[in-house]
Amino acid sequence: MRYVNEHYGTDETMSEDRKRRVADATRMAESMDEVPVHLVVWLDMSVVAVTDSAAGRPSVVAGGSVFPFIQNVQLAARAEGLGTRITTLLSEEEAAVRALVRAPQDWALAALVLVGWPVRLPKKLSREPVETFTWLEHFDGPRFTA
């Protein structure tokens, strides 16, 4: 709840609508013990190329290769009729998780993927049209159209 309190406010300061939305968003955390498989994904930092380390901001590329891997795991699970959820919020407790699974010190916790049999299969998701978030050449250039 520390993350929620820091980013969205406490129960005392949140509107009723926001409380409902936060409760919906945190339902996964409250029922994680009911999910049969917890796939804890670690990244061997000794082989990671942090190409944006001098950018003066947190790295956005350091673990870039791990998320396509996770997506492939999720797609394979889906093909078998399984559902998945991914979260990175467990990283706040990396030291405790490291001790629990005895992960090496030079490995980083990338994500937790929950895998189980879904109560119902999700509908096909709708996506924003590509031209609403892509440009040609530069940000003030013409929109990219598919």
Task: Give the residues covered by each predicted segment.
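Short linear motifs at secondary-structure transitions and domain/linker junctions
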Residues: E12-R18, I86-S91, L109-A110
